[in-house]
A protein has these predicted regions:
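Bacterial N-terminal signal peptides that target proteins for export
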Residues: 2-13
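Membrane-proximal basic amphipathic "stem/tether" segments
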Residues: 7-8, 25-31
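Bacterial N-terminal signal peptides
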Residues: 12-23
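Histidine-/acidic-rich catalytic cores in large beta-rich domains
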Residues: 28-402
Length: 402
């Protein structure tokens, strides 16, 4: 026989459960999405006195998210989009190419690889452009408001004089690349086609033999260039001294499969400068070559992320090159402690440090000129060319100044 106290206890228990169902905020119930954590990676090193303070844009490769992080790894803003490349704009919007190494096989992103999109701070779409082919690897909003990007260009077999190519290379279309500049109305203002500037038999330092071997053998197309970076030449001391090759507005381009960095004259559209390197066998792959801007330590030099997968066998490094003498001014090489088989980037910071995005591992770290790691963030997944922004870069960023 149940006692009165037992009955009262049971009634109280039921009342508490019912109250909980009505009082617990709906965002915490199982029927709704679980709240997103404030951080999904880990800051393992942070020397506040030596690190350059700012915000880090961290595109996640492995799920549709781009994070804006503070120096402690806290996620300050989150865009729910896949990004092969993402750039924060001065108005707080995000300029994006979809189709990352993960997203190119996931809906809806795999069907959006011809798109360039701009999202506002809240993640709402505010502008888009659909290209004629796949947009890939790199883009940027120019000071004049136009957008510069890389475009895949497939050249059909019947449009090429195949007698000038190796017999095995006459069996497939050739993949080349173009650089395109459009205005906000989507009108093309300038374009450059690599196949108009170079002979099909030229493959840079690597030579064209790789196209005929093993896994690199021609499949649906001859992957001739595989450009992965395009950057404008900024104002610089070399041009000020009269060297026309480094005229501001010229383009620094990385045809990855050539293992060669080139500069293209914007007016003549000719290749006016090349660098293949000689350090430890020369460039092997390579990403993100760009000239350090005026006012930053090393101004005028060119930084290159050398992946090192094939020539250097699993060891990446950063090169800082004097583009006139072609001498190395600085090298970051720590053997197998630093390696990203694909992708990757680096950025010279105002205090002289260098931010490095080791994309394949999801690690982003900042080093001093003496190679001391003074900030390090390890994400749960891979990333795609993370970058640091000043607190005053955009109006929304100011709220997070420390």
């Amino acid at each position: 026989m149940r006692s009165v106290s037992d009955s009262v206890f049971r009634l109280l228990t039921v009342a508490i459960v019912l109250a909980a169902l009505f009082l617990i905020p709906p965002e915490l119930t199982a029927e709704t999405d679980t709240p997103k954590p404030e951080s999904e990676g880990l800051v393992t090193v942070h020397d506040a006195d030596k690190a350059y303070q700012g915000l880090t844009l961290y595109p996640v490769t492995g799920k549709p998210e781009v994070h804006l992080l503070n120096m402690h790894g806290k996620i300050l803003n989150r865009w729910h989009v896949d990004a092969d490349r993402a750039r924060l704009l001065p108005n707080g919007n995000l300029l994006v190419i979809h189709g990352s190494a993960w997203g190119r096989n996931e809906e809806p992103w795999e069907n959006m690889r011809e798109m360039i999109r701009e999202y506002d701070w809240e993640g709402e779409l505010v502008w888009e452009y659909k290209a004629s082919e796949i947009v890939h690897h790199d883009l940027q909003r120019l000071p004049n408001g136009n957008t510069l990007f890389l475009l895949r260009h497939i050249i059909p077999v019947d449009e090429i004089d195949r007698e000038t190519l190796d017999e095995k290379r006459r069996e497939a279309d050739i993949r080349s690349d173009s650089v395109v500049e459009i205005d906000m109305d989507g009108q093309i203002q300038w374009e450059w086609h690599l196949h108009d500037a170079a002979d099909f038999n030229y493959c840079g330092k690597r030579s064209c033999d790789y196209l005929l071997r093993g896994d690199d053998m021609i499949r649906e197309f001859d992957n001739w260039t595989h450009v992965n970076s395009v950057q404008l030449v900024p104002e610089n001391k070399w041009y000020d001294a009269g060297d026309e090759r480094f005229k501001p507005g010229n383009l620094i381009i990385m045809p990855r499969n050539w293992w060669t960095v080139i500069i293209v004259d914007r007016d003549s559209k000719k290749i006016v400068w090349e660098y293949q390197g000689d350090y430890r066998g020369g460039i092997s792959g390579g990403h993100e070559p760009h000239m350090i801007q005026k006012g930053l330590p090393g101004e005028g030099n060119i930084l290159i992320f050398d992946n090192g997968f094939q020539v250097h066998r699993g060891e990446s490094f950063i090169l800082e090159i004097n583009p006139v003498s072609l001498e190395r001014e600085w090298t970051y090489d720590v053997g197998k402690q630093f390696f990203s088989r694909t992708r990757g980037s680096m950025q010279r910071l105002p205090n002289g440090n260098t931010l490095i995005s080791e994309d394949n591992t999801g690690r982003v770290f900042e080093i001093t000129p003496d190679e001391e790691i003074v900030w390090e963030y390890k994400g749960e997944l891979e990333t795609s060319r993370a970058g640091r922004y000043d607190y005053d870069y955009c109006p929304q960023c100011l709220a997070f100044a420390e």
